[in-house]
Swiss-Prot record:
It comes from Treponema pallidum (strain Nichols). Directly involved in methyl-directed DNA mismatch repair, DNA replication, and gene expression. It catalyses: a 2'-deoxyadenosine in DNA + S-adenosyl-L-methionine = an N(6)-methyl-2'-deoxyadenosine in DNA + S-adenosyl-L-homocysteine + H(+). It holds the Pfam family MethyltransfD12. It comes from the Bacteria. This is DNA adenine methylase. SUPFAM superfamilies: S-adenosyl-L-methionine-dependent methyltransferases.
Length: 303
């Protein structure tokens, strides 16, 4: 894959790992079979792997419990040109009133392609690119006022990568980065996509699983079910199950006593990670988190 064909994350996602992707890559096993990512979110590690020409991924399984997110991945993979047109239509109509109408339509829409188009439009026009739902599962993020830099909706390039005009409300301007969406479509061509609970994946001995759940004690409203302490305990038990079956796994989570206790049998390394979504750029800073593996990797420590 050439530099110009390198795909980048096409959604902004709370807890996204784009800045950490090189570090995560360095801690992956040298060899493995199939690749699984059951909390795909923005998919930063997957996109990083796609950009590494020395990595040859064979069977790739990306999944998440968030249905609109998986609709977006599937639409990019299977119907990217139609998706570009539909998102462009939403952008052309972009006003505060239209945003509120689109948000209401998104809550009841059942057509996968239109769900994907609305999802991507809302993801880039909402406040700080945050995806959040209430207990009824309805997207409830207000309209954004800042213009976020984005590989999907291009706000900063002097020469737009879009054949469609930008929409602007206040100082929020959004364009479709068609080039990146097409690169993403090519990268996703041979992937298996599923909307499912993390426990539904079926890796075999020697396969590799990267798990990036909503962190303990942090934002988890990606889905109406949330991700509470019991879900974290269930995930830790699932990782024990993976280990017993000879499946290689790497897991990211917040650095706290509970997480260290749940994963005591495994290797734990502390990382400093940038905060990608916060109320202001000043507040984004860094947070401590841990990287947990059930195999030896470079610079692993258990402080």
């Amino acid at each position: 894959m050439s530099r110009s064909d390198t795909a980048r994350p096409f959604v902004k996602w709370a807890g996204g790992k784009r800045a950490l992707a090189p570090t995560l890559f360095a801690h992956m096993p040298q060899t493995f079979g199939s690749y699984f990512e059951p909390f795909v979110g923005g998919g930063a590690l997957f996109w990083h792997l796609c950009a590494c020409t020395r990595v040859r991924l064979h069977d790739i399984y990306l999944s998440d419990i968030n249905w609109p997110l998986l609709c977006a991945y599937a639409a990019v993979r299977d119907r990217v040109e139609e998706l570009i047109v539909r998102v462009g239509q939403h952008i052309a109509c972009h006003t505060p009133t239209y945003y509120r109408l689109a948000r209401r339509k998104f809550a009841v829409c059942e057509h996968p392609l239109e769900v994907a188009a609305l999802f991507l439009y809302l993801n880039r026009s909402c406040y700080n690119g945050l995806y959040r739902v209430n207990k009824a599962g309805q997207f409830n993020v207000p309209l954004g006022r800042a213009a976020p830099a984005s590989p999907f909706l291009n706000t900063t390039a002097p020469t737009p990568r879009s054949t469609q005009p930008a929409a602007q409300v206040g100082h929020l301007a959004i364009r479709i980065d068609e080039e990146n969406l097409r690169s993403c479509a090519r990268a996703l061509a041979n992937t298996t996509l599923n909307c499912q609970h993390f426990s539904c994946i079926q890796p075999a001995r020697g396969d590799f699983v990267y798990l990036d759940p909503p962190y303990l004690g942090t934002f988890s409203a990606y889905d109406k079910t949330g991700f509470d302490r019991a879900a974290h305990e269930s995930l830790a038990a699932f990782c024990m199950h993976l280990d017993a079956r000879g499946v290689l796994f790497m897991l990211s989570n917040s650095d706290c006593p509970e997480v260290r206790a749940w994963y005591r049998p495994f290797r734990v390394q502390q990382l400093n990670a940038p905060r990608c979504i916060a109320r202001s750029a000043h507040a984004r800073g860094k947070r401590c988190e841990v990287l947990i593996t059930n195999y030896p990797c470079a610079d692993t420590a258990t402080p």
